[in-house]
Regions:
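Membrane-interface "cap" regions at the ends of multi-pass membrane proteins
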Residues: 1-40, 53, 57, 69
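Select transmembrane alpha-helical segments in multipass membrane proteins
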Residues: 7-17, 50, 82-96, 127, ...
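Residue-level recognition of transmembrane alpha-helices
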Residues: 17, 45, 89-90, 128, ...
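Helix-loop junctions at the membrane interface of multi-pass solute transporters
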Residues: 17, 31-33, 73, 77-79, ...
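Hydrophobic transmembrane alpha-helices that form the core helical bundles
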Residues: 32-35, 44, 53-128, 133-136, ...
């Protein structure tokens, strides 16, 4: 069976995963998590990060033992040796990828409409069409574009942090803790925040 050529370097692969984490986790999910966890938003992201870290270490160990692209589909195929189960896993992965793409496209609409008042369906269709063309261009070219976008995203976050540092401090840390949400809200927000850490799975799938 012919194999795909390895065209991604380590920096491109790292930016490929980081782009998903920053784009989805910060620019799309931040408001949703803050709406549930309120002042405890940081705790929700910390909890989600700890859970995702365990999964990430598992993916890192498995991908080092089986250095082939495929991610979870490959791991299921090796573990159970059942072709039908691998196909089921592939369809599950495709479904979750479609849902992830829909979430990110929906989040992009809010930013786009700040500048141009187009309808949401039109923006989503155009964005999906552009992303399809980029993906069809090639994995290396897509990763380079993602790296550029990721640098812009990180630059935007640094700018926001710099501007926010100049603002007067309105609440003390004690007041923030007193206004924190309960454990139930933090846990619910952590489930949503977990989505922000899907980048490691993308990295394993294309490595």
């Amino acid at each position: 069976m012919a194999e795909l050529r390895r065209r991604l370097t380590l920096p491109l692969l790292a930016f490929y995963g980081l782009g998903s984490i920053v784009g989805a986790g910060i620019y799309v999910l931040l408001g949703e998590v803050a709406g549930i966890a309120q002042a405890s938003m940081g705790l929700a992201f910390l909890l989600a990060g700890l859970i995702a870290g365990l999964t990430g270490f598992s993916y890192a160990e498995l991908s080092s033992r089986y250095p082939k692209s495929g991610g979870s589909v490959l791991f299921v195929d090796i573990a159970f040796e059942r072709p039908w189960l691998s196909k089921v896993m592939a369809f599950v992965l495709l479904f979750t990828s479609a849902v992830s793409s829909a979430v990110i496209c929906h989040g992009f609409v809010g930013y786009f409409q700040l500048y141009i008042e187009w309808s949401s369906p039109l923006i989503i269709v155009l964005l999906c069409g552009v992303m399809f063309l980029v993906a069809s261009w090639g994995i290396r070219e897509s990763a380079i574009l993602i790296s550029i976008i990721t640098l812009l995203e990180v630059g935007g976050l640094i700018l926001v942090c710099f501007v926010a540092s100049e603002l007067p401090q309105r609440e003390s840390f004690v007041q923030i803790i007193d206004a924190s949400a309960g454990i139930g809200a933090i846990t619910a927000a952590a489930f949503i925040a977990f989505y922000a850490f899907i980048g490691f799975e993308d990295m394993v799938s294309v490595a």
